[in-house]
Design a protein with these regions (language model features):
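N-terminal lobe of the biotin/lipoate ligase/transferase fold
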Residues: 1-129
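Catalytic cores of processing enzymes, dominated by hydrolases/peptidases
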Residues: 132-145
Length: 145
């Protein structure tokens, strides 16, 4: 199982990145392309999940993009690293909770290298430091990819 690793240096437009990821999902499903791990930053934008409400926004001057993911709002901006995985779960363990735990443990170990004590919360997905979220995790699966 070969995973292509892509690291974008300049901020990537959120809408364009999602279109590229959706195309890659279809290519992985059809066997045309390898799985992908894409590290990038986005231009400043709020993404609103299915539970988002504009009254929760801290700034009304930032572009808002509605998404089909769960959750409320997430702000993306230059300097904030985002890692997207496009994985074929037919070739891997299909346990999504296990995958999320592996990602959480990876983030905890990276922060530990910088002497930052962090933890995963059983009730709230993500990584936390002193009761404040430092790392968000979102997962979307389409036909096992």
């Amino acid at each position: 199982m070969t995973i292509e690793v892509k690291n974008s240096i300049k901020p990537v437009d959120y809408v364009k990145s999602i279109a590229m990821l959706e195309k890659r999902v279809d290519e992985v499903l059809s066997g045309k392309k390898n799985e992908l791990l894409w590290i990038l930053e986005h231009e400043t934008v709020y993404t609103g999940g299915t539970s988002s409400n504009t009254k929760d926004l801290l700034s009304k001057n930032i572009k808002i993009i509605k998404t089909n993911r769960g959750g409320k709002y997430t702000v993306h901006s230059p300097g904030q690293k985002v890692v997207y995985f496009v994985l074929n779960l037919n070739k891997r363990d299909k346990d999504i909770r296990k995958l999320i735990n592996q990602i959480e443990n990876c983030l905890i170990n990276i922060l530990k290298e910088y002497k930052i004590l962090s933890y995963a919360d059983k009730k709230n997905i993500g990584i936390w430091v002193n009761n404040r979220k430092i790392g968000a995790i979102g997962v979307r699966v389409k036909n096992t990819v």
